[in-house]
Amino acid sequence: MQGTEETEANRRNRISELPDCILLHIMSFLEARDVVRTCILSKRWKDLCKRLTTLAYIPSWDENSFKNIQSWVLSSRDQSCSLRNLTIDTRFLEGEEDLHTLVQYALFHNLQHLNIKINPSLTPKPELLPLILTSHSLTFHELSYRRGKAAVKSPILLKSLHLPALRTLHLEYVNFVATHDHYVDPFSNLRALNTLVLMFCALIEDALVLCISNQTLSSLTIFGVPSADEFLLSTPNLSSFTILGCPIFQQLLSSTCNLSFLQQVNIDGFSEGIGTASVFLSWLQVLANVKISKIGYSVIRALDYVSHSSILSLLLLIKTIIWILKYVRRCQCSL
C-alpha cells in the first residue's frame, strides 16, 4: 500500500516538474473554473493559471459563476500576458455588463480567437458588437445569437465589417440590413477572409440581395437563409461552396466572375416549395466551372415538383457526365 501511495505521489510530482509551456498547453483544454482551481494544488501551480492565454467559459448552475470568472480575469490574471483565445457560452439570464467588460478586456489583450454564444434571454449591450468590429487582432470570430425563428427580432444588425486580420467568420442568427439599393454587402472590407459560414441569418427591412463580395474568400457555407431573393457572388478565389436548407428553386444565384478556382459545390437540404426549374438551371450555369458537384437527394426529388423537371434532369445528367469526363482527362494527364 505504501508503495502505491509513493507511486501516485511520484506521478503528481512528474506532472509538476513539466515545463511551464507544457502545463499551460494542458490547461488550455480545461474549462475556466477548473483552470482557476489549479492554483490551490501547490506553490508550483499558484500563479501558473494567471498566464494562460486560452479561456473557455461553460455555464454552470451557479448564477454567479460567470461574474466570478470575469472578476478573476480582471483582478488576478497577469496583465502582461496576451489573451489569445476566448470562448463564452452565455446561457445565463443576466450579465450584459460582465460580458461586455470581459470581451473588452480580451480585445485589449491581443485577442485572436473569439467564440460567443448568446442566450435568447440575454440582450447584449449595444456597444458590444461595435467593440468587436474595431478589433485589429481577431483572426477567428464565431457569433451565435440563438434567436431561432425569432431572429428577426434580434437587435444585432451588421452593415459592414472592418476586421483587417480576420480569416474565419461564423455567424449564426444574425440579421443584415441593406447598405444600398436593397443590397447587403457586409464582407467586402475583410481583406484577409478565407472562410465564411452563415447559418440561419436573415435579411430584414428592405434588404433583398445578399452579396458575398470578397477577393480572398476561399470557402463559403450558407445554411438556412430563406429571406434572400438572390445571392450575388463576387469571389474570384472561391474554391468551396456549400448551400443547405435554402429554397434554391426560388432564389437566384449570380456571379460577377467565372469562379475559375471552384473545386467543389455541395447543394442539399432543400425544402419543397413553389419555384421553377429554370432558376436552378441558372445555378448550374453560374457554377459551370466546378470540378466536383454533390447534389443531395432532396434537390433531385424536388425536380418532380417543378416545371420542366424532365428537361432539367436530362441537362443535369449530361452536365454530370461532362464533369466526369473532364476529371478523367485531368487524371490521365497527371499520370
Please describe what each predicted stretch is.
Residues 322-335:
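C-terminal, well-structured subdomains that either form a transmembrane helix-short loop-helix hairpin
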Residues 113, 177, 199, 203-204, ...:
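Extracellular beta-strand scaffolds
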Residues 103-105, 128-136, 154-165, 182-192, ...:
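A structural signal for leucine-rich repeat
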Residues 78-91, 112-119, 138-141, 263-268, ...:
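LRR N-terminal entry segment and analogous cap-like coil->beta motifs
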Residues 2-214:
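Leucine-rich repeat
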Residues 1-2, 284:
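Short, polybasic Lys/Arg-rich linear motifs in disordered N-terminal/cytosolic regions
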